[in-house]
């Protein structure tokens, strides 16, 4: 003591002298900072990671490892004397035990205080109590039966017991594996957390000291090890977690390798407990599910179901100051007892409240995992932990960060399921909703500062939350509609065992990723340049590859006769809206994708994917028996096209009806109808196969009339500046144009067919294309509309002439719209006089302006006008989307823009161009950008 006092005095004097020197010489450089104070006999500075104890005599601090005092022993010391002081004042004084039922055993046992959990009296009483058997709720099964498919179908809501290791995928050391082997693989210097059961308090100890305690038959107290995670040790090689835990685990499936956050290691725990070790009721951190396997010994689980009432009671009990004095099993309706013997494996689901008693010395292995089956319960448990102010040591590491990773991945999963036409399972939808709610809560202004730390750098929180909202809303809207069954696919992107068939969804997803990887655009391109390159690429395509996807219909026409080899690569980049071509109508169906065996590419390697799904994806309508017979009687698509072309040129309409469109496509949809009056005509034997109701007329005048009428541009087709003069090859061009719209290109065959066609006749007659092309479903279906309001009339002679000429012009113009005719039209220019053009434009404007009226927000046609209204070769943005146009969707090289550029002819000479359409750059911008009026939103 004298030496210590002298040292203190000397230190004080030195400090005073240094202070005086600094005051007397202010101009000098400041002295270096004093060294940190040192403690203990080792004279080392303070280390927060090492246990230290204070001497009650000299008031100096000593490392427990330097003076031979364990942390769990320190609580039993009443007065501590360091080695120097012990020589003068004697050894340390220990506390005296006065009870066996309280955590503080120094309290006087007057019988007034209740028993606390973990004490010797508590364990003795617990062993003597009777509980309902867990056999009432537990599910026992073989390892091969416990699959992800089973849990997704039946849920993971009750504990599962697997008596044997067979087919479970769990690999463990032999039952002869001891605590000394653990020390050898993990290392004796590793500091571990140890539970002092009698006090229900945590302390730290080296693994070597714990093994020494465990092997000692005379144990002064009960110590339990429940949190030795060994994933980063050599012992990890001896243990493989069950297959089901690995397949379901969020960490295994969603945690990115390049994350700035350290990967949570919670899958491999070694539990070593001596007899009478007890862990009070708890929910595993983050609401994780847990698996336990008893290598040797025995454990008893007390299980409580996580009902809303029980969870509320648990939170109240956990926050109570008398928690240790109340056995939680007495507060609930039922507490089940489950004995896990050597070799048994127990799976405890999310949120189950459980306590564990070690009935005999035991070594067990276990692990925790988050998964998609109970996302809502996991989030509820996490929020409960925050309200209870649970220490970070007992929380799931980076729980919020992994929630962001999972939300981002599940958003992609739901979008792919929707794209593939599958309905996500209810547990996944409910989980995404709960996750979306939690993410929104964390991003509130008053709370974002608390949660910003765990937001990953590669996640845009606001955008992700908005996208989740859209997907959830879309799923809710689709819930009432019939959809394809998804089966039970895996929602985690993991590989299945070889003996378990992979569902169609996995094959599509895998092939999609491979395809996307091959065609990935360099990241240094901006959006405008990307779309500009795509458009320029399309402009160089062959004329017969019609750009059906880019039309203003904002829909997708799936060609029945187009082989998969002719589908351009960019067709996969379409929007989600589909217009399905059925047997008789164009029907908008937003529920499912159209699938056809001929349209499958590399994405459909699975045999299950190649099954036709038209019945599940489309609304079908019965056609007349005559049309079915005609369709069945045509063995080849080419013959059907030839016959439909001949029939198109040989009939005359006498009655016409049209209707306005509705957004919904119902079963009562009716079509545009044209009834035909019968007249005598000549027909060859080959034409009798497709004869409908009217007799045929001679077609030479029809062709000439079509060509003459086509030279006069309709008001709605002004973007075509110049036209080709009539030539001897125009017949071939007209029919070849119609075939190019159908996806076929048989030029030589067409020439032979045209030569064999009878061309003698005098009168013009026109048959409805939707009827005469019964064998060509795609061409016929373009003349149908959804839910029309039907009206009809008997046409007069002048009305018939107007209808025939108007439709002939549109039909001939559409049929001639291919790249070859466009190039010819640029070479052979035919100009009309300005007076004639002005007169025609004014007369057509008067007729068209009086032909339609808006009633109840829908378009209806005046009976005096027979031609359908079209705008620039596409649907007008101001009209309903589903309204039918008598113009096929055109290739980008031939389609006019939504706002056409000014026409540089005499009719428009002197007029200012439209705003935003004066230059080619502005017009290209109109093509690349979204339509601003809200209708037909899509990218080219």
Swiss-Prot record:
Q: Which InterPro entries is this protein grouped with?
A: JHD, JHDM1_Histone_Demethylase, JmjC_dom, Zinc_finger_PHD-type_CS, Znf_FYVE_PHD, Znf_PHD, Znf_PHD-finger, Znf_RING/FYVE/PHD
Task: Tell me if Methyltransferase is a UniProt keyword of this record.
Answer: no
Quote the record's cofactor note. Answer: Binds 1 Fe(2+) ion per subunit.
Zn finger (PHD-type) start-end:
37-88
The free-text domain note is: The PHD-type zinc finger mediates the binding to H3K4me3. Binding to H3K4me3 prevents its access to H3K9me2. The linker region is a critical determinant of demethylase specificity. It prevents the active site of JmjC to reach the target H3K9me2 when the PHD-type zinc finger binds to H3K4me3, while it favors selectivity toward H3K27me2.
**Region of interest: Disordered:** 483-509, 599-670, 710-729, 818-854, 876-920
Q: What is its EC number?
A: 1.14.11.65
Q: Name one Pfam family in it.
A: PHD
Q: Which residues bind substrate?
A: 279, 299
List where Polar residues composition bias occurs: 613-623
GO BP annotations of the record are: midbrain development; positive regulation of DNA-templated transcription
Residues forming the JmjC domain are 230-386
**CDD domains to which the protein is assigned, alphabetical:** PHD_KDM7
List the source organism.
Answer: Mus musculus (Mouse)
Q: Which GO terms describe its cellular component?
A: nucleolus; nucleoplasm
How is this protein named in the record? Lysine-specific demethylase 7A
Lineage, top-rank taxon, reads Eukaryota
Q: Where in the cell is it found?
A: Nucleus
